[in-house]
């Protein structure tokens, strides 16, 4: 009997339909913006989230790091939860790539609240402390065990960002799960954030890839940052086709994943060596 691997949603493999989409994909040189499958994915995701433009990246960490680079200058500071992926699981990229420090905040299950933002912003005219320029939130939260933000809470944080002149980035590696679990309208996300990264290789089952969405001016600059980080790809439409198939055909099935995870949690709850993340 084959084992069931529940270590992570990153161990997913392409379905038969996804493999067929990959093998039949039309491709070109994406560095020249001539890969029709990449272009189709980018256009679809931008429209899906109500954003102006999107850009395909090989990994989520690269997309997040590009966003941080776009929104900050060396010596500045971003605000994030102490459990955030951008701080804990991206190899120190915030400091290495952007020369930026992190103001880390607490909060239940990896979630920030709007009332935490103002006290965390350094006085802009006090040159002894780094200038605060960016807030990063994560939905769903990785170390928080899949906790989801209410859309109104994200809007409240966004309002604080506007008040203090801060950029607002969403690490949405598992945003697909939040959309299904909370029955949220994805088109409300694009106008709310300066940038959003969404991963295709977890619950959606694609082999690789993340898409960064935002305003056209930001995404145009993101192309240069992606190049600097080594993310330019050629005939990558085979992978982009897998991601587009996952969104169009497998997104709704995340609800089944959630149901099964809940059933498994109930079975494990009686074991004294298993701890709930909720």
What is each of the regions a protein language model found here?
Residues 1-278:
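Conserved PLP-enzyme active-site core in the AAT-like
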